[in-house]
């Protein structure tokens, strides 16, 4: 009688344990495109129209949540303890994923769908790897868009120049200029993109023109970014215009911005 091969039992046991222990979505191929949701940014913007808006409000910023799944889960639990009327929404500074894989987007969604506040995000450079850009478009919608909250316009755009080999198309400064003109009657304009113009991953032929556009637009108040993983709030070009870089969520920190008419205050918070 043939004895059973113990190695087969071990492999079977390992497989069963992995399947039973896995509480998150599983992906059979890194090329798989099966998003769990669509047009998340527009859904969040639509939610904003259902709540009272005024010129005094606060919002939170998180960024670079790739591989920070435990920290993201903890942030959601932390933020859900914040009173609903003290925060309007959350901005995400990009890099939802590390490799642009569908399962990474799904892992992010598994956690963020439990957050009680609307979340609006910009595309990060890691989100453009592989077929990640297409998945981002399905999950979140357009890369360049704007929305209003009260008397403030938020302009969100792709600034990941290196991912397109600095071909001159990212960021789209013509589109950006048009959006600032459309928002001319608003009290404030706040910008959101992943890579700040001082980074070498930003097309340096566009850095000064963009900085000049932002600093000379009368109602421009703040430009928000991620990418560098460390908190920074300063003038990058000595032109009086402030830039804010949000830290990676791996540091268990995020940023709160308070808007009071045309005055903004910024604070880094930990949880």
What is each residue range found by the language model?
Residues 65-68, 96-99, 125-129, 154, ...:
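Solvent-exposed loop/turn segments at secondary-structure junctions
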Residues 80-89, 164-241, 267:
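His/acidic metal-ligating clusters that form di-metal
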Residues 1-22:
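Sec-dependent bacterial lipoprotein signal peptides
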Residues 22-107:
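N-terminal active-site segment of His-dependent metallophosphoesterases
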């Amino acid at each position: 009688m043939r004895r059973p091969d113990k190695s087969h039992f071990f492999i079977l046991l390992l497989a069963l344990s992995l399947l039973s222990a896995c509480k998150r979505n599983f992906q059979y191929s890194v090329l798989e495109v099966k998003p769990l949701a669509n047009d998340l940014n527009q859904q969040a913007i639509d939610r904003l129209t259902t709540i009272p808006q005024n010129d005094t409000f606060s919002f939170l910023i998180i960024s670079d949540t790739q591989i920070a799944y435990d920290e993201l889960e903890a942030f959601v639990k932390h933020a859900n303890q914040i009173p609903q009327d003290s925060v309007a929404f959350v901005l995400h500074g990009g890099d939802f994923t590390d490799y642009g894989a569908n399962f990474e987007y799904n892992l992010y969604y598994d956690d963020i769908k439990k957050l009680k506040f609307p979340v609006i995000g910009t595309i990060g450079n890691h989100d453009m790897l592989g077929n990640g850009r297409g998945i981002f478009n399905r999950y979140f919608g357009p890369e360049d868009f704007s929305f209003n909250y009260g008397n403030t316009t938020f302009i969100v755009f792709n600034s990941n120049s290196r991912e397109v080999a600095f071909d001159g198309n990212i960021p789209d400064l013509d589109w950006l200029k048009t959006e600032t003109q459309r928002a001319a009657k608003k009290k404030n304009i706040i910008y959101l993109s992943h890579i700040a113009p001082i980074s070498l991953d930003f097309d340096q032929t566009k850095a000064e023109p963009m900085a000049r556009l932002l600093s000379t637009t009368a109602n421009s108040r703040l430009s928000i970014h991620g990418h560098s993983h460390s908190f920074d709030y300063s003038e990058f070009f000595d032109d009086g215009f402030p830039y804010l870089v949000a830290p990676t969520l791996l540091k268990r920190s995020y940023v709160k911005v308070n808007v009071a008419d045309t005055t903004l205050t910024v604070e880094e918070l930990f949880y």
